[in-house]
Amino acid sequence: MNASSHFCSTLRRLAPLARAFPLHAKEARLRPLFDPPEFHRTLVAAISRAKGRISLCALYLGTGDLEKELVACIDKTLSVRPAVRVRLVFDGSRARRKSRISGISTLSLLLPLLRKHGPDRLSLHLCSMPAAQKAEGLPPMLGEIAGVFHAKAYVVDNELIISGANLSDEYFRNRQDRYLHIGKGPEIADWYHNMIKTLGDCGKTVTIPSQINSKFEFTTKSPKCPVREWRKALESLVKPVNTTIGLAESLPFPDEGKPPDTYIFPTIQCGPIGMDHDTTVLDAVLDSVPVHGSVRLATAYLNPPSRFVEKLAAAAPYGEVSILTAHRDSHGFRGAKGLMSYVVDCYMRIESDLRPLFRSARTTLSSKDLVPCPLYIGAYRRPGWTYHAKGLWIRASHKVPCFLSVAGSSNFGRRSFDRDLETQMVILSNEPNLRYAFEEEWSRLSRFINDSTSSSCNDTATLDSATRSNKNTRPLARLLSVIFGGFL
């Protein structure tokens, strides 16, 4: 089966499961951004030229210099262009937590902007998971442990950046993530704008305190959205418009002159309200991988549920399955204090346990003629940097570039599937330049793999080396990873 056939067969598989957005990759200016400074520059530039709408959602907005520059850019755009409207949505717990460095929170930083421009120009919303709502009144960190609004999407007019990166100083400087930019995509930008609006409406709206020096940072005017209404609103967003897709060319497309070369399928996952759309679409993606194809997975926090491990094991059984995750020296929780200092050890423990689990799942695929290929786990280690990238790259074989990629906020872990709210997009493309750009993404990430701690689960010598590299993992980590694994 050639690349075009894989494109069409995968399209047929995905079309009944998610809303499809066809486009021409070159005309839409769809491209990956490769590093934090480029992400920051692109976002600030888009905001500075906004003419109608700015809709941003993330876990939180930091309070450092680069974040203040971003806020100043929003302020200036609102001041010089009366038609611009801004909508911001953040996690209810994380946005209230004060920075240990600056002593202020996301809400504190944005309140002056809200006072200046008013709620008609700028609307600020907090979205909390049901478990976190029950923890209201307790320290914000406890609400974050229970579950967070983890989606990241940045819409400016008809531009869109989908990413796993928050709006924070380190994500603009030296925390490597993944970022896909669409420079001209009115339909997909509309979809994400509507998603952000829906999530904001299901959360709380921040209002201006009646007293300038009120001890309360904010008040709210929106009631808690019942779970059934929340789920209904999100399901209406992802529902396919056309579920009887045959050939690729039969999907609706505004330019009848030439068929689209790329399709985007956005997904939403919110386990706490029973919204498993992303899980369903990911299952279909992995089912579409040819037996001699390749699956490459990146995640900052490696903690996949057993059913996802089984799906990975069954995908491309005689091809490549590779995972790229954080080395302990570039881990996001490196340097944490107290009980949180065990988080890195827990992830190292989970990684070690994953290898035999994957090997066992693959053993059932063995035959007399073919032996399944092993799993390769690489550790990203870069001095002075932390690692936060996530995504999937699918190839039909090792000889052709990636034809499908998944990008967004999910870490493909137990927490992503069961506790947090996530959004991703599946990009299915036949456009050569975009496919090679996806390959370059993976190449840039994998150049920082630390060979001393990377291994194949079928390679005993390398596996022993990886086990020795985790010898500093504290004994308590195994117990903690079992007890709190669902929260990691």
What are these regions (language model features)?
Residues 55-57, 294-299, 378:
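Short catalytic-loop micro-motif centered on adjacent basic/acidic residues
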Residues 193, 220, 224-250, 255, ...:
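Terminal interaction modules at protein C-ends
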Residues 10-49, 63-291, 328-399, 415-417, ...:
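HKD-type phospholipase D/PLD-like phosphodiesterase module
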Residues 311-315, 422:
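Short, solvent-exposed amphipathic alpha-helical segments in soluble enzyme
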Residues 86-88, 321-323, 405:
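Hydrophobic/aromatic residues located in beta-strands of well-ordered beta-sheets
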Residues 57-59, 89-91, 298, 324-326:
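A cross-family glycoside hydrolase active-site/sugar-binding cleft signature
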Residues 165, 356-488:
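Long, C-terminal catalytic modules of enzymes
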Residues 3-19, 130-146, 464-488:
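Alpha-helical membrane-targeting segments
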